[in-house]
């Protein structure tokens, strides 16, 4: 089942964050350091208290996946329409649980949550080379919104 993460989940989430880091490190070792996480325990505990940054976990007796989200709103902008967006900052399914629909359950829960709080859309970023993630998001109905380009000097 999917639920909002609590402080009890911090250790399991940290382990999943290590898996995410290694996926990114393998794809882009020039950008991502190996064997680290983007949050430590204290930062993660603090993040769990921020209502604008909900974190959800898939839990079947143990945490098998997570979704880090960020809710943003644009209002009264000169150029942009008023829009409320749920950005998926990070989604991970434990290596041991892949292919068991954990990712689908997490994504659908986040989608339903976004609808329930009045979001107009869901966005996320996928690193070039992360083909399994790209395929998964396309299967969930997501489409390319924009493309970021780079040249390595």
Label every model-predicted segment.
Residues 42-57, 87:
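A short helix-loop-beta-strand connector motif used in the catalytic cores of GNAT acetyltransferases and
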Residues 1-15, 24:
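A short beta-loop-alpha structural element at the N-terminal edge
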Residues 104, 108, 116, 128-146:
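Conserved active-site alpha-helix within GNAT-family acetyltransferase domains
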Residues 90-93, 99-112, 139:
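Conserved acetyl-CoA-binding loop-helix of GNAT-fold acetyltransferases
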Residues 22-44:
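Conserved GNAT-fold acetyl-CoA-binding loop/helix
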Residues 123-133, 150-153:
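Conserved beta-strand-loop-alpha-helix junction that forms the acyl-donor binding cleft
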Residues 57, 62-71, 87, 92:
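Conserved beta-strand in the GNAT
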Residues 114-125:
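Conserved GNAT acetyl-CoA-binding A-motif
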